[in-house]
From Swiss-Prot:
The lineage of its organism: Bacteria, Bacillati, Actinomycetota, Actinomycetes, Mycobacteriales. Keywords: Cytoplasm, Methyltransferase, rRNA processing, S-adenosyl-L-methionine, Transferase. GO terms for cellular component: cytosol. This is Ribosomal RNA small subunit methyltransferase G. Specifically methylates the N7 position of guanine in position 518 of 16S rRNA. Its EC number is 2.1.1.-. S-adenosyl-L-methionine binds at residues 81, 86, 131-132, 149.
Length: 227
């Protein structure tokens, strides 16, 4: 497991390669292969926009991998709407102790994910389907953590995510500056759905120029929810 030592502020001169080596450690070579894959196959297959290539390390690989700060050793993780594998694949590379399942409905994306996982020996399961489908819940449900990135508004995301985790499991939604606004707007609906202990946390503080903003919620028994 990697550890980030907060230094109270942004580094004066950010070195993305040094940051990547700190986060991915001995598995940096796999992370580099993923970077190259996204920059080539990912663009060609329409999984990543060409304008994103210059900032793949900062905005994508590292932005996702640092969420591992919120996940305990050996936990099971379901990544909903995984797309090109974000955040699931960076997490799997940085944290081989985790048991990760990538859920993706589109064929071209799920094929890409399966190819990368197999060719790089990652202990990751790829499930093609939508998170809300009963077959997906049966195959991937009961997880400790469910992750997502830029998938949907919080209320809809909770409807898809909460059934995939056990009681007291956690939903980790990577969000941007709108996180507080989304919580304020959807809090009542989230409570009815069984999402408790809502808060906003930052990951990668002192490591990334812009920390990753995560909305965190715990699945709580609905009978304890108050109207």
């Amino acid at each position: 497991m990697f550890h980030v030592e907060p230094n109270g502020g942004e580094p004066a001169e950010w070195d993305e390669q040094a940051a990547a080596r700190q986060v991915f450690g001995e598995r940096f070579d796999i992370a580099e292969r993923y970077y190259k894959s996204l920059a080539s196959d990912g663009v060609e297959r329409g999984l990543i926009g060409p304008r994103e290539v210059p900032r793949l390390w900062e905005r994508h690989l590292l932005n996702c991998a640092v969420v591992g700060e919120l996940i305990a050793e050996g936990e099971s993780v379901v990544d909903v709407g995984s797309g090109a594998g974000l955040p699931g694949i960076p997490l799997a590379i940085a944290r081989p102790d985790l048991r990760i399942t990538l859920v993706e409905p589109l064929l071209r994306r799920s094929v890409y994910l399966a190819e990368f996982v197999e060719s790089n020996g990652l202990d990751v399961l790829v499930v093609r389907g939508r998170a809300e489908e009963s077959g997906v819940v049966k195959e991937a449900g009961g997880a400790d953590v469910v992750t997502s990135r830029a998938v949907a508004p919080l209320e809809k995301l909770a409807k898809w995510s909460l059934p995939l985790i056990h009681e007291h499991g956690r939903m980790l939604a990577l969000k941007g500056s709108s996180a507080a606004e989304e919580i304020s707007r959807d809090r009542a609906s989230l409570t009815r759905l069984g999402a408790g202990k809502l808060d906003i946390v930052e990951c990668g503080v002192g490591l990334l120029p812009v920390p990753t903003v995560v909305v965190r919620a715990e699945r709580v028994p609905k009978r304890r929810q108050r109207r």
